Amino acid sequence: MPAKSSANGLLILIDLDGTMVSCGLIPRQALTNAIFHHTGKMVEFGYSQLAGLTDPLIIDGALERLAVPESQRNELNHKILKTYLSILAEWYPQATDRILYPGVVELLEYFHECNFRVGLISGNSKKGAGIKLKPFNLEQYFSFGVFGSDHAERDNLPLIVLRKVYQKFNEKYAPDRVVIIGDTVRDVQCARRNGMRSIVVIRRADQRQAILNENPDIIVNNFEDLQPIQHYLQQLLIPPFA
């Protein structure tokens, strides 16, 4: 059977942390505890050591800062990730500081109404993403996803997405028919390096200029006003020279 595209030929990939939700302090505390459990050392995380990175690279960076020999990091990384996910599953349901950003549900409903193929693109492991999505009942909006457990390098995730979509739905998308929605410089870079389009929501004022420097296709301050995103996506649906 020949591969097909979705009804209107757009594939939307949306990031989780910082884009749709603010997960609060619990994930960071869970990871810190997991690292301490396996190394006996405490580590702190700044924004640049977390934003846009996959879980395996976040852990590897922490182990490097703790001067753990490179030969030990791979095995230790797997152990820490397993412990982290166990702690996260126990602690996160009780978190009181997690936030679903305004307009996210409306945005996802709009994608559904437009019959866009929508997937999750996240540096979390698949299990970790599920834990974070569940309290907000967001799983229903995603027919598939690609995660840090698929590949440690974020830039490799889009190609995995295209393969997954073909295998699961028998659909093919040209890179310029794929839109990545995120909140960090790395999201924009990931889209550009794969020939895809990018929409960025600014969640931190101190990151605005760095994001602007990467020239995303569109920047929004929040998802409460969906018109800029709707207009941009509708323009993509207009055939050339129409």
Predicted features along the sequence, with ranges:
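Short, acidic loop-to-helix structural element flanking the phosphoryl-transfer center
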Residues: 2, 13, 89-120, 130
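Active-site neighborhood of HAD-like aspartate-dependent phosphohydrolases
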Residues: 2-51, 57-60, 64-65, 208
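Conserved phosphate-coupling serine/threonine residues in phosphotransfer and NTP-handling enzymes
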Residues: 122-124
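Substrate-recognition "cap/lid" segment bordering the active-site pocket of phosphatases
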Residues: 98, 126-179, 185-194
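Structural recognition of alpha->loop->beta junctions
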Residues: 137-145, 210-229
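Acidic, Mg2+-coordinating phosphoryl-transfer loop and its flanking beta/alpha structural elements
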Residues: 180-218
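Non-catalytic pre-domain segments flanking phosphatase-related domains
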Residues: 1-14, 64-69, 177, 231-232, ...
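Membrane-embedded alpha-helical bundles of multi-pass transporters/translocases
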Residues: 35, 85-86
